[in-house]
Amino acid sequence: MLVSYNWVKEFFQDFPLTAEELGEAITRTGIEIEGVEELSASLKNVVVGEVLSCERHPDAEKLNKCLVQTDETEPVQIICGAPNVAAGQKVIVAKVGARLPGGLKIKRAKLRGEVSEGMICSLAELGFESKVVPKAYAEGIYVLPAHVETGVSAITLLGLDDAILDMAITPNRADALSMNGVAHEVGAIIHQKPAQPTEPDVSEKGKADDFISVEVENPAETPYYAIKMVENIEIKESPLWLQTKLMKAGIRPHNNVVDVTNYINLLYGQPLHSFDYDKIGSKKIVVRSAKEQEEITTLDGEKRTLQAGHTVITNGVEPIAIAGVMGGEFSEVTENTTTVALEGAIFSSSSIGKASRELYLRTEASIRYDKGSDAWKVEKALAHGGALIAELSGGTLVGGVVEVDNREKAVNKIETSLTRINRILGTAITLAEIETIFDRLGFVLEVKNDALIIEVPTRRWDITIEADILEEVARIYGYDEIPVTLPATSTTGGLSDSQKARRVMRAYLEGAGLNQALTYSLTSKKDATRLALSDEKTVALSMPMSEEHSHLRTSIVPQLIRSASYNIARKNMDVALYEMGTVFYATEGDNLPIEQEHLAGLITGNWHTIDWQKTPKPVDFFVLKGIVEGLVNKLGIKSELHWKQTEKEELHPGRTASLILEGQEIGYLGALHPAVEANYDLKETYVFEINVAALLDATKEKVVYHPIPRYPEMTRDLALLVDKNTDHATISQVIQEHGGKLLVDIELFDIFEGESIGENKKSLAYTLTFLDSERTLVEEDVQKATNKVIEALQEKLHAIIR
């Protein structure tokens, strides 16, 4: 948020800090200031001038020869190329010797033979970004109001004798997304109470009920909705003070109605929206959920398709605004507007955030609703906005508001103690200091024996538990004032067995070709239950930052799927990821959730083997199966890993297996269901997820080291035809049992099914590797072992050797 230093000072009678000092003080209390920009640092000798005459340059069609009065001396001639310059205008003039942003220094010059003694400036030439310059002046100079005195400093007039603090507001401090909120924060720092904003004293006439009525269909999504009416208005430019406040905050001025809604949003952090009353087409506003595929053209001219669940403002028939996000073009305020219906509302932060993300439409209003707002300041903001519109437009403020109020006000009281504060913070704060701290914060403190009971104002809705109170004490007391203490004991370094095992797993998976991923533990309600190993209940956050991060995950795989989709959308087509992280399951009552460590992986695209001579091949079930089996072997687990075909929602019904270790199901491995792959624009994709605790707790074999073989190995390829229902594990077991001590490795390299070999048959091809560590093998040794394997396969599995 861009904060004007001069605007902050307006809240206080005596302000003791410079802009730089204020930035440092705010940063020390927990809100980072990313930068402080002095707007006038590169400006000098810029004044208000009056264009006395304006005529075309004799030798340049696009240039104008202007006679400009800048002070009490003789007027000067200035050559200007702006298309909107005209006689009688009050303009911004950089005199000879002036300095402008970018190091530009104004000198007396000749342009096409005519002398130019200065420069008539646009706002962009004074340092304003083009996106905040009013559209009427986007292609030319800025024209000042006619009443402005000639010769005065344009730097002061435009509020450029100011500094802008760029505040990085964290999600929990949305109260600071307003000047009023910033003023409270600054007041706590400088030991002063900020003045509260006051609306203009405007008389009211008539009743708002005579103009419109309001109906809210879902009070949970819209706890409060109100309309304030202003009639007989004249749409025109806002006064200079309002335009400059908006531009310095990064907002483009439009007109005296829209600018007031943006100003109130900045001042209170409460979004308002203005409807052209005559365009609504009804005397009734209905707030409801959008219908699936319902459409609205928003103020930016885009036609948007809504989803069920988006909250919309309607005239009883069709949407006129997307609640909390953006108004509709249908009811836009224009230069012909004479009556305004001004909306002030409280919407569900989760629903507004969800709509904003799904529509890819992020606005100043949606940002504030998404992060949360003070539900009890909306009436004051609406009253201020209505009165200011009436004052600036010469309109009539209609009496009363039309409202639907379903808010429930609860006093937020939190209890702690002085002893607990000092013990946790490591301080020796006195009760008197605590009382001063809470007074500076504007919190009400009640002392009962040893207990401190703090009543938190509604503007600080982020404070809900004792830890929040302790943080506030630490912030205002000063983090740099908290004594540094050393640990009471020392510990010896070293890794536990489980830490060593985790390092082995990571090293093995990375060596196998997978890249480590780190994804959020927070996910949406929908994703929280997908592809979980357990059917336990999910854990919901009490104060989620957004709907997309409202639950703790029960599986890592959904986040890996999103990561793969993100990579493929950016043309990284071959993705191999793994993550070792925590999943969470709910427990009964208010007990802490169960935390389990899981290992998950994903491969999609082509698989690149280590051998440079082999070409990449599409991923398949057996690539990932081999990696998982290799991981189990690497950990030295004594028991064999068994595979059992299974079915799991969102996985392919014919390519999914559960992993069985020591008689316990510890995970799953399978291909994503084609519908899931299509939803994320993925090609064939395989995933696995394993309970890490089961791997760590499994019985391990003793590590035995063998010398590197001195003698060469020999291989034999074996292709066999077996019944379609015979699985690879059974075949591998028979080969292992009858291959003898010389057989050191079995690799399946081909599977074939088709009409040419029979309907209920399949062909599997294996490479058998033989090795003797004591001598060089001869053909007779290998053939003898191979024959035993063939005989066993024929006898036990009725295999046909091809």
Swiss-Prot record:
SUPFAM superfamilies (alphabetical): Anticodon-binding domain of PheRS, Class II aaRS and biotin synthetases, Nucleic acid-binding proteins, PheT/TilS domain, Putative DNA-binding domain
Intracellular or extracellular location(s): Cytoplasm
Domain of life where this protein originates: Bacteria
Broad class of where this protein is predominantly found: cytoplasm
Keywords: Aminoacyl-tRNA synthetase, ATP-binding, Cytoplasm, Ligase, Magnesium, Metal-binding, Nucleotide-binding, Protein biosynthesis, RNA-binding, tRNA-binding
Ranges of residues in domain FDX-ACB: 709-802
Gene3D superfamilies in UniProt: 3.30.56.10, Bira Bifunctional Protein, Domain 2, Ferrodoxin-fold anticodon-binding domain, Nucleic acid-binding proteins, Phenylalanyl-trna Synthetase, Chain B, domain 3
Cellular compartments per GO CC: phenylalanine-tRNA ligase complex
InterPro entries named in the record: aa-tRNA-synth_II/BPL/LPL, B3/B4_tRNA-bd, DNA-bd_dom_put_sf, Fdx_antiC-bd, Fdx_antiC-bd_sf, NA-bd_OB-fold, Phe-tRNA-ligase_IIc_bsu, Phe-tRNA-ligase_IIc_bsu_bact
Domain B5 positions: 409-484
Domain tRNA-binding: 40-155
CDD domains on file: PheRS_beta_core, tRNA_bind_bactPheRS
Biological process per Gene Ontology, one example term: phenylalanyl-tRNA aminoacylation
Required cofactor(s): Mg(2+)
EC code: 6.1.1.20
GO MF entry, a single one: phenylalanine-tRNA ligase activity
Co-factor binding comment: Binds 2 magnesium ions per tetramer.
Residues engaged in binding Mg(2+): 462, 468, 471-472
Reactions this protein catalyses: tRNA(Phe) + L-phenylalanine + ATP = L-phenylalanyl-tRNA(Phe) + AMP + diphosphate + H(+)
Disulfide bond residue pairs: none
SMART domains with a match to the protein in the record: B3_4 (SM00873), B5 (SM00874), FDX-ACB (SM00896)
Quaternary data: Tetramer of two alpha and two beta subunits.
NCBIfam families: pheT_bact (TIGR00472), YtpR (NF045760)
HAMAP family with a match to the protein in the record: Phe_tRNA_synth_beta1
Homology family: Belongs to the phenylalanyl-tRNA synthetase beta subunit family. Type 1 subfamily.
Protein's name according to its UniProt entry: Phenylalanine--tRNA ligase beta subunit
Protein source organism: Listeria monocytogenes serotype 4b (strain F2365)
